[in-house]
C-alpha cells in the first residue's frame, strides 16, 4: 500500500501507527485512554504495484463480504462506499450462516426448494470444524460451493469430493434398505446431485 494506518484499542488504551510502502514512518504511539476494543485499518492501494487499477469495484466487494458473513454466522459487516455524492451502504449479518447462504442462492436463481427444511450438519475435531448445508430444488442443475478457511475452493478438494461420495453412498444405502432400488441397481453421483444446492465449509488449523 502507498500508506497504511492502524489503530488498536485494547480496552484501556488506544494505539496508532502509520506505514508508507511497508515501512513504519513513526513509532507506535499511545494516543490516550479508551474502554473500546477492536482494530481499525485504513490504507491506500499503491498504483506502483497495482498497475492495472486501484479503483475498488463495489459489487465485487459486496459479493465477497456477503460470502464471509454467510460463512461466519453472527458476524456483522458494514460495507460503505463514500466515493459518490450519495454514500452507498450495505449491512451484512446472517444468524443462519451457511443455511442462509443456501436460501440466498435459491432466491437469486429463482428456484423453489422441494423440501421445507435445509439439511445442516456440523462436526468438530479439536480445533478443526466442518459444516454442510444442503437443499434440493426444482431445477435440474446442481451447485456445490466449497470453502476452506473461508476461501472459495473453486477447484474443489477432498472436502468437496468426500461430501459427494458420502452423499451418494448414503442415498444408495437408504434406497437398498427400504427396497427403493433392486440389489443390482444404484444411484450414480449425477443422479444424487441433480437439483442440489450445497455449501461445504471446513476450517482447519495449520498442520
Give residue ranges: language-model regions:
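GHKL-type ATPase core
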Residues: 1-104
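GHKL/Histidine-kinase-like ATPase module
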Residues: 59, 66-68, 74-207
Amino acid at each position: 500500500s502507498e500508506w497504511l494506518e492502524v489503530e488498536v484499542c485494547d480496552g484501556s488504551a488506544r494505539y496508532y501507527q502509520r506505514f508508507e510502502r511497508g515501512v513504519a514512518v513513526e513509532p507506535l504511539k499511545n494516543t490516550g485512554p479508551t474502554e473500546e476494543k477492536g482494530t481499525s485499518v485504513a490504507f491506500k492501494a499503491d498504483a506502483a504495484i497495482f498497475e492495472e487499477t486501484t479503483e475498488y469495484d463495489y459489487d465485487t466487494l459486496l459479493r465477497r463480504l456477503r460470502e464471509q458473513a454467510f460463512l461466519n454466522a453472527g458476524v456483522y459487516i458494514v460495507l460503505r462506499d463514500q466515493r459518490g455524492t450519495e454514500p452507498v451502504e450495505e449491512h451484512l449479518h446472517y444468524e443462519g450462516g451457511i443455511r442462509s447462504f443456501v436460501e440466498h442462492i435459491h432466491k437469486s436463481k429463482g428456484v423453489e426448494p422441494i423440501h421445507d427444511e435445509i439439511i445442516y450438519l456440523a462436526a468438530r475435531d479439536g480445533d478443526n470444524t466442518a459444516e454442510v448445508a444442503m437443499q434440493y430444488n426444482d431445477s435440474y442443475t446442481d451447485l456445490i460451493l466449497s470453502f476452506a478457511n473461508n476461501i472459495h475452493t473453486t477447484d474443489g478438494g477432498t472436502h468437496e469430493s468426500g461430501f459427494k461420495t458420502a452423499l451418494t453412498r448414503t442415498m444408495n444405502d437408504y434406497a437398498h434398505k427400504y427396497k427403493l432400488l433392486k440389489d443390482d441397481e444404484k444411484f450414480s453421483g449425477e443422479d444424487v446431485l441433480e437439483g442440489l444446492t450445497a455449501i461445504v465449509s471446513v476450517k482447519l488449523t495449520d498442520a
